[in-house]
Amino acid sequence: MADKADKMKARLPRGFVDRVPDDLRAAEKMMATIREVYDLYGFEPVETPLVEYTDALGKFLPDQDRPNEGVFSFQDDDEQWLSLRYDLTAPLARYVAENFETLPKPYRSYRNGWVFRNEKPGPGRFRQFMQFDADTVGAPNVSADAEMCMMMADTLERLGIQRGDYAIRVNNRKVLDGVLDAIGLEGEGNAAKRLNVLRAIDKLDKFGPEGVRLLLGKGRLDESGDFTKGAQLPEAAIEKVLAFTAAGGADGAQTIANLQAVVAGNAKGEEGVQELADMQALFFAGGYEGRVKIDPSVVRGLEYYTGPVFEAELLFDVTNEDGQKVVFGSVGGGGRYDGLVSRFRGEPVPATGFSIGVSRLMTALKNLGKLDVSDTVGPVVVLVMDKDTQNLSRYQKMVSDLRKAGIRAEMYVGGSGMKAQMKYADRRAAPCVVIQGSQEREAGEVQIKDLVEGKRLSAEIEDNVTWRESRPAQITVREDGLVDAVREILDAQARDRAEQSK
């Protein structure tokens, strides 16, 4: 016997999770609905591998000299650095560039899959998670960006999120770049300070205008005593940035007018405002007013966005880990990234896309009761009488007949007795079990026990003697009538579930 000290400890790596059947079914149910909407819009599925050459990830690497920083990387036999994909956008850029001559332009695609982050895990922060992306490559007009926003709105509603419980918030990176240029932060030399400004604005919902003011200036001291160094902007520059974030009006037209005033005289900023105005016109033409909102506070953190940026936000309250009521918040976002594909091509390649955080959206739908898979029906289990190996072929025929009729079924293949088999069937959420002992076999019959009805009746019968004598929810039928009898039981259970859900 092996020494106990030699036993390997079973443990899950930090930042990763196992997914159980209900989670998998819920995810597939949700993603099937998303695919339906994307297909309706004329997007095509594509799949790229989990592994890419590290240099193909480009700006996704925080430090080019340390490829393991932020991504999971390894070297192959040729000493080429390979990495698990960090998101789904960089692999798409590589795929489009590699197949550019044969793909239709614009190229409209969607894909879902796992992405990996070599970062410190924490509550709600995982090293492996799923994204669902849609992108249009080769469309320079903001109509492609507007379409992304409208498609996301339709997706949320198809998933059961009511109008008024979500908003697609839209901004334009060019408008903010115009503001940054106006306060003297133009050019590559100010890239770090520009990024600090972006990060400060991104905290508007969390810290409010005064908190952002501190982050734009010398810095902010939080309640725990931790100090975050600010962007060190002068007061006049801070006021200009805050005027931009406060430009939201009562409606899109008012917001656009306010933004025009903020960037007046700056060509890049004015171009961005005009793009927002063009998108606003498309939203109205499509009937999306109120569902898609121009919002100057939207600043996606990724540096490669070059034009419109957008975010899908759920507006209903949930209870956080501290028992506080908070707005659920973002479940996805995206924008225009004209520079990503052109890294491979050496020529401008316009692109825009949207990414959904699958796990986060699943959590939202479960909170709303829109993703219930608790009524999943397990397989019918054909029990095997104790040590009855001679009649396995007979049991197997029953299972095959049920499967041919489209009924989920399995023959018990373990080595336990009848009591343990019944417990197994219960854990499998079996709707019923099929039993054939020697007496039933001689008579050409089978017993079918309705486990759902039996569980209900057991609550009404307190006397064990009465229970054994009444044998509730158990019927005996001819062996050739097995399929029809099982189907009747399953249909009755389905009707009961439908009635209970009303």
From Swiss-Prot:
Any one of the GO CC terms: cytoplasm
GO molecular function terms attached to this record: ATP binding; histidine-tRNA ligase activity
Subcellular location: Cytoplasm
Domain of life: Bacteria
Pfam families named in the record: HGTP_anticodon (PF03129), tRNA-synt_His (PF13393)
E.C. no: 6.1.1.21
Disulphides: none
Catalytic reaction annotation: tRNA(His) + L-histidine + ATP = L-histidyl-tRNA(His) + AMP + diphosphate + H(+)
Main location: cytoplasm
Keyword line: Aminoacyl-tRNA synthetase, ATP-binding, Cytoplasm, Ligase, Nucleotide-binding, Protein biosynthesis
Complex and partners: Homodimer.
Cited HAMAP family: His_tRNA_synth
PANTHER family given in the database record: HISTIDINE--TRNA LIGASE, HISTIDYL-TRNA SYNTHETASE
Name recorded for this polypeptide: Histidine--tRNA ligase
Organism, scientific name: Brucella melitensis biotype 2 (strain ATCC 23457)
